[in-house]
Amino acid sequence: MSDIVSISSARPRLLVSVRGPDEALTALRAGADLIDAKDPERGALGALPPETVRAIVAGVGGRAVTSAVAGDGTGREIAAAIATIAATGVDFIKIAVGGADDAALAEAAAQAPGRVIGVLFAEDDVAEDGPARLAAAGFVGAMIDTRGKSGTTLTSLMAAPQLAAFVAGCRTHGLMSGLAGSLGLGDIPVLARLDPDYLGFRGGLCRASDRRQALDGARVAQAVEAMRAGPRADAA
């Protein structure tokens, strides 16, 4: 695991989803803050094989924070998947939480204490008490993402006040927060104003803006530059 894990930052940090060690190095060299392992061919929360996650973590070598998708199953299935991915040495493990009850959430978080992040989908009705429930269950963070990956963006599904309330709820309950969902470089100024811990990208930083194609190091570098510049005063 990385020695530089942090759940807070002066401004949003850049999460880049990668599908293998080569892309992880591309993202790392371009300045990404968090390297997120997932399979873009399998939707929003497609899990990679544990050996691939392990290779990504080894390649990053503690130079950035790492996360990996465990999947979007439920019950014993997801509990076992969390334990398996946790054993790779990745810093954080992401799972879909959907309509899971409090007992199921607590069971999931207990598989890797202090390392599980719950993912909520923008297409669903994201409950206001989501951050509070995840914190009570033992999760370390919460993210909003889009389930569909056909180009519909987070900002077209949820208004800025809704996203701001989610980020504020995470902060109130001590959770790391993240926003993702078919984001492009143009979304950074607006979403950065909401001050989440992370903004997550995949397709917008790939060749031809196609999440199934290879990660483009130049685009990652542009995203890093935009993140470091901070939100524009006119980006309301």
Curated annotation (Swiss-Prot):
It catalyses: 2 D-glyceraldehyde 3-phosphate = 4-(hydroxymethyl)-2-furancarboxaldehyde phosphate + phosphate + 2 H2O. It comes from the Bacteria. One of its GO terms (molecular function) is lyase activity. Its EC number is 4.2.3.153. Keywords: Lyase, Schiff base. Pfam families: 4HFCP_synth. Belongs to the MfnB family. This is Putative (5-formylfuran-3-yl)methyl phosphate synthase. The active site is at K38 (schiff-base intermediate with substrate), K94 (proton acceptor). InterPro entries: 4HFCP_synth. The keyword Lyase applies. Catalyzes the formation of 4-(hydroxymethyl)-2-furancarboxaldehyde phosphate (4-HFC-P) from two molecules of glyceraldehyde-3-P (GA-3-P).
